């Protein structure tokens, strides 16, 4: 983590699916908006960069291993972050969890003073790590992550409990052990107890303020 002043601060939040990444990202976002203003901070989700699969049938899309780094278009994410650092706006893809592919719509995203980047595989890519000014890893027990994922995917993403459990056993847990957990070594800060860890939130906010003022 650098101590120099930054025109754009990028904070990376990684960890298992349903480990609390989105919660801590949203909490930091909402609290910093009150200090910096709505146009000064934004959140980018790695999920938006799942590859376009419109050329595949639905049956083929369902079989994709979404917990493997190859499922994500990190080339485009690196390109977009580099453009934002340079002061250029980008169009972020939108991804449909029900259609398992990108949508035709995009989300315009203007340069911000602070960008919070959250996703399961962010720390597996050295190019993304090099763009981050600070990175954290949500170190939440897998059994808790599974319970949260069941509730989220059934209630919010139209999944069945059986399909969620099968995916967890087939790809989610194995890919966590192969890719996500080993990437913890690259994190500047490891956060236990999920996204409601108040000490971690306050520490990250203080770090962001420090980098903004130099």
UniProtKB/Swiss-Prot annotation:
Binding-site positions, ATP: 15-22
Enzyme class: transferase
Subcellular location, record wording: Cytoplasm
A single Gene Ontology CC term: cytoplasm
InterPro entries from the UniProt entry: P-loop_NTPase, PRK/URK, Uridine_kinase, Uridine_kinase-like
Similarity section: Belongs to the uridine kinase family.
Protein name, UniProt field: Uridine kinase
Pathway listed: Pyrimidine metabolism; CTP biosynthesis via salvage pathway; CTP from cytidine: step 1/3; Pyrimidine metabolism; UMP biosynthesis via salvage pathway; UMP from uridine: step 1/1
Gene Ontology biological process terms, A to Z: CTP salvage; UMP salvage
Catalytic activity: uridine + ATP = UMP + ADP + H(+); cytidine + ATP = CMP + ADP + H(+)
Pfam name, any one: PRK
MF annotations from Gene Ontology: ATP binding; cytidine kinase activity; uridine kinase activity
Organism superkingdom: Bacteria
Enzyme nomenclature, EC number: 2.7.1.48
Origin species: Aeromonas hydrophila subsp. hydrophila (strain ATCC 7966 / DSM 30187 / BCRC 13018 / CCUG 14551 / JCM 1027 / KCTC 2358 / NCIMB 9240 / NCTC 8049)
Key words, A-Z: ATP-binding, Cytoplasm, Kinase, Nucleotide-binding, Transferase
């Amino acid at each position: 983590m650098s101590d120099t002043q930054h025109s754009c601060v990028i904070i990376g939040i990684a960890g298992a699916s349903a480990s609390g990444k989105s919660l801590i990202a949203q909490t930091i976002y909402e609290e910093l908006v009150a200090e910096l203003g709505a146009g000064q901070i934004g959140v980018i989700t790695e999920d938006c960069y799942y590859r376009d699969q419109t050329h595949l049938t639905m049956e083929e899309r369902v079989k994709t291993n979404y917990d493997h780094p190859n499922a994500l278009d990190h080339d485009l994410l690196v390109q977009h972050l580099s453009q934002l650092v340079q002061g250029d706006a980008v169009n972020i893809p939108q991804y449909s969890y029900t259609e398992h592919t990108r949508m035709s719509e995009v989300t315009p995203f203007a340069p911000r003073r602070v960008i919070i980047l959250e996703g399961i595989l962010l720390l597996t890519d050295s190019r993304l790590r090099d763009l981050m000014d600070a990175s954290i890893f949500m170190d939440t027990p897998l059994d808790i992550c599974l319970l949260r994922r069941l509730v989220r995917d059934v209630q919010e993403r139209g999944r069945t409990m059986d399909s969620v459990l099968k995916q967890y056993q087939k790809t989610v847990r194995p890919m966590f052990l192969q890719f996500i957990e080993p990437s913890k070594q690259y994190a500047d800060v490891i956060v236990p107890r999920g996204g409601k860890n108040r000490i971690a939130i306050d520490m990250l906010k203080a770090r962001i303020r420090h980098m903004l003022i130099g």
